[in-house]
Swiss-Prot record:
Record bears the keyword Repressor: no
Gene Ontology CC: cytoplasm
Name listed for the protein in its UniProt record: Arginine--tRNA ligase
Lineage start: Bacteria, Pseudomonadati, Pseudomonadota, Alphaproteobacteria, Hyphomicrobiales
Annotated catalysed reactions: tRNA(Arg) + L-arginine + ATP = L-arginyl-tRNA(Arg) + AMP + diphosphate
An annotated GO BP: arginyl-tRNA aminoacylation
Origin species: Agrobacterium fabrum (strain C58 / ATCC 33970)
Matches recorded under InterPro entries: aa-tRNA-synth_I_CS, Arg-tRNA-ligase, Arg-tRNA-synth_N, Arg-tRNA-synth_N_sf, ArgRS_core, DALR_anticod-bd, Rossmann-like_a/b/a_fold, tRNAsynth_Ia_anticodon-bd
Gene from which this protein is expressed: argS
Amino acid sequence: MNIFADFDTRIKNALETLDLVKENREKVDFSRITVESPRDLSHGDVATNAAMVLAKPLGTNPRALAELLVPALQADGDVDGVNVAGPGFINLKVSVGYWQRLLADMIGQGVDFGRSTVGAGQKINVEYVSANPTGPMHVGHCRGAVVGDTLANLLAFAGYGVTKEYYINDAGSQIDVLARSVFLRYREALGEDIGSIPSGLYPGDYLVPVGQALADEYGIKLRAMPEEKWLPIVKDKAIDAMMVMIREDLALLNVRHDVFFSERTLHEGNGGPILSAINDLTFKGHVYKGTLPPPKGELPDDWEDREQTLFRSTEVGDDMDRALMKSDGSYTYFAADVAYFKNKFDRGFSEMIYVLGADHGGYVKRLEAVARAVSEGKSKLTVLLCQLVKLFRDGEPVKMSKRSGDFVTLRDVVDEVGRDPVRFMMLYRKNSEPLDFDFAKVTEQSKDNPVFYVQYAHARCKSIFRQAQEAFPGLAPSAEDMAASVALISDINELQLVAKLAEYPRLIESAALSHEPHRLAFYLYDLAGSFHGHWNKGKDHQELRFINDKNRELSIARLGLVNAVANVLKSGLTLLGADAPDEMR
């Protein structure tokens, strides 16, 4: 049950009973009403702006409307009190019985508590990582991988039909460079002295096994071929090897995609899919022949002072028109982007989410223009830009590159601190804000280390169940047993913990709808703090302890509360791609 959705319905039903509303029903818009937690929890459990947004169309002032609504709200048996604050905000105090029933519902739903149908099966494509297949994942890829993967998990939990996608950039000039770099390692594997790696090729040792694999499979055959013969063979082998490496790196972060889409497929059949996309835009009136003025600053590779086939993107929100086909008939990189979006649209996605690095900020408007033109407004495009991650150790900056010139890899970071700290901390700032990652801090066993603090809360929940078995040998209450005992949960501290848990369904929906997965990390930290705080009170006040060895039934009821906390923590950590340990080791 979503307490805020529930009281949204109750408040609207109460409004419908007012004569003033009945007489002016066509003038009021209930969709503007919000129901949320009050900023000051001492004011109540639920707050609404109903009187503030409806007073003007009803020809009255907010406070007068609020006072008029109070008796109708007080008639609700689950409302213990109503007060009007300031100019007309309404705060409601929820009854103990309501919290108890809500707790029973949480216990019954288990880890599915918070699951939503708000997405109604709407198909969403989330594309993230999409690193060039030219080497291992470096630490700069971590943030986009975690943001995209967690957002996709949230959207699925909120009822959307989600596809996690990786776009393989395997058609650009960098792939030729990769193939020539691998061929050099192939020659090395055959026993040649290749000397130092020439400038412009990839120097990393990660290509040595790829060259050796080619030598094992082909012997000296490739060496005897002209470049136009061996290049496509080596390209295929190199891309396959790089994608195996990338998949393994991502698996270390618990990141797995449903679809790996190859850019090369867009160029098959002389670029048939790209031409089809251009023809589609032409049919819709978005393509013309012309020349583009030189852009300010450094000229891009695809600019030329000749007539080209252009996308009239300024008419759909872009800053300038974009070239689709050069004067020689070859396609631009942007044309492939258009074809890729059309492919997604043709697959039936109503929203496409691109998770990109901050250096792609200049692409946002052109991608949005493509979405408007191709889908004719039927499909939404959202771009999330991830700012840089800076590495620290004990507060001191860590160089992002090694002595060899290679970047610190994703594997380096996960091997040192573990998967869960990386996943959690990559979400502990909004994606649009820079993030500092301190190797020392994320391995601390303290409140200052969010992932430890949250996982420790789950482990502590499980330890309470073990303590219960020590106090009451053989005690293993079922969910039904615990739910049946919730009437014994009445202490204000316990009810405040239930109220914190009750925020979870709203949190899931808001984080999914706003595309802000960091909200989940913040919520879990707050929930862990509430739980640890209540546990600590039990050290000084025996009557607040979760296990009362003289009262079996009360202990079972409180185990139900602990169970609900554990389930929400496990649910949230799972969505984050992290473990919920039963014990901290």
